[in-house]
């Protein structure tokens, strides 16, 4: 993955392609009970020290790392990641409220795909104990990733997230796999050689059981449509959740807003909120014509 990012950046036509800012790695230091569609055989413990090899191989390409903050030995990984400038996000976690509270005090700034693959309220001796989900909603300073593809979360939960986190505390993500934007069919989740076959109907990817989700097939413009049309979020707020908010979460000041001196990387949406043109550094590199898509 890291090599692919580097190759993409160094390609002869890289200046006309989407800008790759780095990689977001989910795992392998996650809770097996919250693995989602991930293959359990690849889950590791941070106690084995293998995270050092991952950081070395990343060579600066790793920007966000999703880990489960309750794991034994996670503190050493956290320290190593911070030293490399990697942002930590809590996810695929079966931890308690206190685990995310500790994580937030130790440099975590994000929570990965809110509601998906994370613990929630349990009963212990009759008492209710909040989990990672409740901590993510309550704790200030944690930006929440939200898969607003119209499938993972219903409009009611999208509205609840906006009400609790506020428009500035949300980053919309596709959580897409390689079937994104493609026709319905069978696609590989993970490695092309060793990955899992999953089934896309054009709206969502599912595991072979036909029930469990295996990632999204949405493109980012769908997120904006879902938030505005189904969740009732004002357009300017939905746009902010896919532009300025993620830029701020990554600590990037040169993108995410239209302002003199910033990079003129733009996506133009039509009245139907579908993409009709793409600009990079102020130059149009793609547009949708009446006869179909074309690069310029």
Task: Give each language-model segment a name.
Residues 1-14, 78-87, 162-169, 234, ...:
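Short, electropositive alpha-helical surface patch
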Residues 1-61:
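Divalent-metal coordination cores built from histidine and acidic residues
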Residues 18, 60, 106, 168, ...:
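Structured loop/turn residues at beta-strand edges in well-structured enzyme cores
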Residues 25, 81, 111, 227, ...:
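Conserved, mostly hydrophobic/aromatic
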Residues 30-33, 119, 181, 287:
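Conserved protein kinase catalytic core
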Residues 52, 56-184:
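Active-site core of metal-dependent hydrolases
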Residues 128-146, 150, 162-174, 179-269:
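His/Asp/Glu-enriched, well-ordered alpha-helical/loop segment
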Residues 248, 257-295:
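C-terminal cap of metal-dependent C-N hydrolases
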């Amino acid at each position: 993955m890291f090599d692919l990012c580097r190759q993409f950046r160094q390609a002869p036509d890289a200046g006309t392609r989407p800008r790759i800012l780095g990689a977001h790695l989910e795992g392998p230091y996650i809770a097996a009970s919250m693995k989602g569609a991930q293959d359990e055989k690849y889950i590791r413990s941070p106690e084995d020290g293998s995270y050092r090899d991952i950081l070395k191989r990343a060579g600066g390409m790793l920007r966000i790392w999703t880990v489960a903050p309750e794991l034994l030995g996670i503190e050493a990984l956290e320290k190593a990641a911070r030293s490399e400038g990697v942002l930590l996000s809590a996810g695929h976690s079966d931890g308690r409220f206190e685990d995310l509270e500790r994580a937030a005090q130790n440099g975590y700034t994000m929570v990965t795909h809110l509601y998906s693959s994370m613990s929630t309220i349990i009963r212990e001796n009759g008492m209710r104990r909040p989990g990672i989900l409740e901590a993510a909603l309550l704790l200030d300073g944690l930006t929440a990733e939200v898969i607003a593809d119209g499938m993972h979360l219903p409009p009611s939960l999208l509205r609840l997230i906006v009400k609790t986190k506020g428009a500035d505390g949300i980053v919309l993500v596709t959580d897409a796999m390689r079937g994104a934007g493609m026709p319905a069919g069978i696609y590989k989740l993970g490695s092309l050689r060793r990955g899992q076959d999953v089934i896309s109907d054009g709206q969502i990817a599912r595991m072979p059981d036909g029930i469990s989700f295996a990632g999204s097939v949405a493109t980012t413009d769908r997120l904006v449509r879902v938030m505005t049309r189904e969740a009732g979020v004002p357009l300017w707020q939905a746009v902010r959740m896919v532009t300025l908010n993620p830029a701020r979460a990554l600590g990037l000041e040169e993108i995410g807003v239209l302002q003199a001196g910033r990079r003129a990387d733009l996506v133009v949406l039509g009245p139907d909120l579908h993409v009709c043109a793409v600009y990079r550094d102020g130059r149009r590199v793609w547009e949708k014509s009446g006869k179909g898509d074309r690069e310029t």
